[in-house]
Amino acid sequence: MNYKFVSYYDTKIYWTDELDGCGNELIEDLQNATAEVVGNKPINNTLEWCSGPGYWGFSLLGSHQTKTLTLSDIHAPVKPLLEYTIAQNNFENVQFFESDNFKNIPKQQFDLIVGNPPHFCIDPYIPTYNEPRKYKDEGWKIHEDFFNNVSDYLTDDGIIILVENRFGSNPEIFRPMIEKNNLRITNHFGSVKFPLDMWYLGVDKNPV
């Protein structure tokens, strides 16, 4: 396999065209969003949901912003790619689960959960989005299942950050499924790099 890579500090994150969801162009933006939501809170255990090549998680681990990293994705072909990135960077504190949402992830607690899930509930008719697995969450069922189960995996002071697309969604679409699970929206703001397209959603547990 001919892997490409993108560097973040001393970390090389490997990817292929088949497995990339445009995250290779977002790393600095993902880091900016993390700083915006997390602030100075120390992070010990991070989950990257819908990880694909692991741009978000590996960049956090490589820049020492998290001590351990779990990656999860439903798409089995990402596993050897992730293992290659782990080996090339000599990472020891990383695990991967091939999982439909949380179904195959053992119960554990994360203080940061990040994700770049499918951004549209219908076909967006944009040539770039040419593989439904990457972009389509029909009826928002993937998001709904995520919010229905994420509390079991989130520490009481844990933080969730998702990157979404302005042409596919807005905070009010997700608010009902968030609030019904005793979670709350803490932040929503536009991308620095792609302000017309991408936006970020910050969520935590409702303290009441």
Predicted regions mapped to residue ranges:
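Class I SAM-dependent transferase core
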Residues: 1-38
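Short amphipathic alpha-helical segments
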Residues: 83-84, 125-128, 173-176
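Conserved Class I SAM-dependent methyltransferase catalytic core
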Residues: 142-197
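C-terminal edge-of-domain segments
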Residues: 201-202
